[in-house]
């Protein structure tokens, strides 16, 4: 593989549940978008397809969900610190036990940069009350992290990827010819809420193969040298930390990484094709 273009990547699944709660811990009520399992797009009169019908469900977390969220988020700093990532200036990206530190500032810097670029283009930012402005210049100098995550809001319950009820799309991803859905983390298996007493964690080799973090820098792998990663600031399908972790690892290895968090963009892709094509032209 010569180059990678990734829009809103759902990846690093082993750590994604922890990262999600690092972002959304404390948000106990949210809207969950649902659609019928196996539902196909509906054709319209013109012959084109329309997206599947989706419904909005209001979800309120119970005390057990909140406790699970807290537990997951508490383990995220250890994961981040063990990665030993650093930014472009060589600063080590770390978190303390409360989830604060240079890594959090690193993530915030991408959102701040995106907001300033949007403002420079004339975008009305008045609804984004989590933004902190410089009183003299009017530029965005910081964000209120908790307020930002409340604004975006979670769209998944704790155990966002390895669901405790073993029914997420990612659980299905790790299914086998005999079992539709499987857990892929020990944590979710230990906290499984289904009546099934034979809780099965999918083969560790398969879980490893699904995570690019296990191959970036591995002598057993040949890595792409060019990466373009985009994850919108309004996207809650994973934590914004996840794609930035992958990009930082690639950058630390000396690869060419173009990484950004387009402002107020939800879970989508191909929204900046001119920029994408220019990037492609410049790396060949």
Per-range role (PLM):
Residues 1-27, 207:
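Primarily recognizes the serine-hydrolase "nucleophile elbow" in alpha/beta-hydrolase
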Residues 1-13, 40, 259-268:
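Hydrophobic transmembrane alpha-helix bundles
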Residues 6, 33-35, 43-44, 87, ...:
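Generic detector of intrinsically disordered, low-complexity, polar/charged segments
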Residues 18, 35, 56, 89, ...:
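Detector for methionine-enriched segments
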Residues 20-82, 222, 232-256:
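Active-site-adjacent alpha-helix of alpha/beta-hydrolase-fold enzymes
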Residues 69-71, 75-103, 111:
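Ubiquitin-like/PB1-type beta-grasp interaction modules and other compact soluble beta-rich domains
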Residues 101-284:
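C-terminal subdomain of alpha/beta-hydrolase-fold enzymes, centered on the catalytic histidine
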